């Protein structure tokens, strides 16, 4: 169960983003302009995919046909990038903490049967059930989250859902800001050591990064193709304990003969 202060923070994030979505969802998703037309708004999502996805398909696909890949977008907002992802990948899922953003995103992808949108609680992916992903993406989302705990919770969740060897590509705030835990617009900032340590704690290899010290600090977190040493040791000792437990049972059974 989440701590009371974290629960309150998540509730505030949801309220604030619902309010922003009702006021002007497209502006708060992409602040380049306030009066987006449908065409312009979704074209801006296509540009994001061209810049951050299509130029990086070797890392993202690793030889797999993108039309056979299942991908997740964290913080899908009103569906700006989600629609563009659906042009590239076979199955696309999106999650967002705001119910109002989710409503608008569902309307935006209503004509795309291979896309599904869910409202989550802002810290985990339980709403998705047992689905595993070939690629996970998040852009201009974590820069708004005021809690390292929430961001790290998401990263651990992605590790749990991402197939071995696969990529979680995402952006965080790398600039120096005086953010407040109550501020759901200017989120927590990360340095290079912060992100390297976070990758290790969450079971990832941070293979590349770009934009450290800026608002657009991009990170390439790869899940290991092999179980970590810690996982291997746990399994080793579990198997040893199981062996001794069953050997004891067999020994007692033989004594009763």
Residues of each region from the PLM?
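A conserved beta-strand element that flanks and buttresses the S-adenosyl-L-methionine
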Residues: 137
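A short glycine-rich, Lys/Arg-flanked "PGG" loop and its adjoining helix->strand segment in the class I
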Residues: 152-164
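Class I (Rossmann-like) S-adenosyl-L-methionine-dependent methyltransferase catalytic domain
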Residues: 2-89, 93-126, 148-150, 167-257
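Catalytic P-loop NTPase motifs of RecA-like helicase/translocase cores
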Residues: 145
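Short catalytic micro-motifs in class I SAM-dependent methyltransferases
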Residues: 140-141
